[in-house]
Amino acid sequence: PWDVLQKGIQKMSILIKNGRVIDPDTRKDGRYDILIEEDKIVKVDQEIKEEAEEVIDAEGCYVMPGLIDLHVHLRDPGQTYKETVETGAAAAAHGGFTTVLAMPNTKPVTDDRLNIRYVHNKAKAMAPIHVLQAGAITKGQKGKELADIDSMVAEGSPAISEDGRSVMDSL
């Protein structure tokens, strides 16, 4: 549940009961219990008897590694009346996503290291998940002059995109 995410799980024990676990790493696909202590999964078994501070009945739910969404629109900076880093990240977390990649079509366009830094700093301060920011390929997403891609990558941007727009002149 969301309230557990908001509290954080670093110092508590959580027992997730009766969930359908799908884990490609261990090839598990079935009904299991999961015991988490101090932010670490310590046991996955068909029936765990240990006590925990928080018990979550996951009957009818899937329990799996966090999902990654490589195309989200957080609209921050500049259009926070539509979405913010915080609200977009919260919505993603509710849906089981632990990492999102925000597209650069913001106002101003995230076409430089300062705007990349702005989003990453805001995400670190208030997002319950990993928020990554794609940099624009061209300045202002106008398709003509290349943005300073090296500086955006150095600032932590893992991808570049025009988010559906064409690059008209790559020279």
Predicted features by range, described:
Residues 19, 39, 60, 71, ...:
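Divalent metal-coordination and catalytic microenvironments
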Residues 12-15, 20-66:
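Histidine-rich, glycine-flanked metal-binding segment
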Residues 58-123:
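Metal-associated gating/positioning segment near the N- to mid-region
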Residues 11-13, 51-53, 59, 63, ...:
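Short coil/turn connectors at secondary-structure junctions
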Residues 22, 103, 163:
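Conserved residues at the C-terminal ends of beta-strands
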Residues 106-117, 122-171:
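Histidine/acidic-residue-rich, glycine-tolerant segments that coordinate divalent metal ions
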